[in-house]
């Protein structure tokens, strides 16, 4: 863990708040990629280290290691590439707070695409505006009936959005 942190923050132990304000620095390489440089690097060093815990109101729980996040994000990369997503594309996510959000966001980082997280409470007009204003190429959403209906209603007004699986 220290190796990963030191790669980007040469100093992270400080004597005081003033010391931190004066001396804290983050080194971000030009080719930095969070998916590869942090998530995958951590998975390579400590594959079984806990990365994510998910729970819901019903008491269900899922635990994911860094290896799980790496493997699931790599599967998501393959899916997104098959669907035509490439570096520079913009993808909107409406996935509530499910674990898949983190796998897909990490995958989009690995590809070099931009992610726009969006609320499941959006209405048709909100989708139309956001999709067109941002040039969204793909929208990935939960299967909730209301969300799906608002997305379907917005499609005729969103010419940039690929319509592979409406």
What spans do the regions from the language model cover?
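Structural core segment of the AMP-binding/adenylate-forming
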Residues: 3-4, 82, 103-106, 110-166
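N-lobe entry segment of adenylate-forming
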Residues: 1-64, 68-81, 157
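Adenylate-forming
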Residues: 39-42, 69, 73, 91, ...
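Conserved AMP-binding/adenylate-forming
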Residues: 59-64, 78-122
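A general structural motif
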Residues: 47-49, 88, 161
């Amino acid at each position: 863990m220290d190796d990963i942190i030191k790669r980007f923050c040469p100093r992270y132990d400080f004597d005081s708040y003033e010391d931190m304000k004066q001396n804290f620095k983050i080194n971000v390489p030009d080719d930095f990629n969070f998916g590869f440089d942090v998530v995958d690097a951590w998975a390579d060093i400590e594959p079984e280290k806990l990365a994510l815990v998910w729970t819901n109101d019903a008491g269900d729980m899922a635990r994911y290691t860094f290896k799980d996040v790496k493997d699931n994000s790599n599967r998501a990369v393959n899916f997104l590439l098959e669907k035509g997503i490439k570096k520079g594309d913009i993808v909107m996510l409406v996935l509530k707070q499910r674990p898949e959000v983190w796998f897909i966001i990490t995958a989009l980082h690995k590809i070099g695409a931009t992610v726009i997280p969006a609320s499941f409470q959006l209405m048709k007009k909100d989708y139309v505006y956001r999709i067109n204003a941002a040039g969204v190429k793909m929208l990935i959403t939960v299967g909730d009936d209301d969300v799906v209906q608002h997305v379907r209603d917005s499609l005729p007004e969103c010419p940039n959005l690929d319509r592979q699986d409406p």
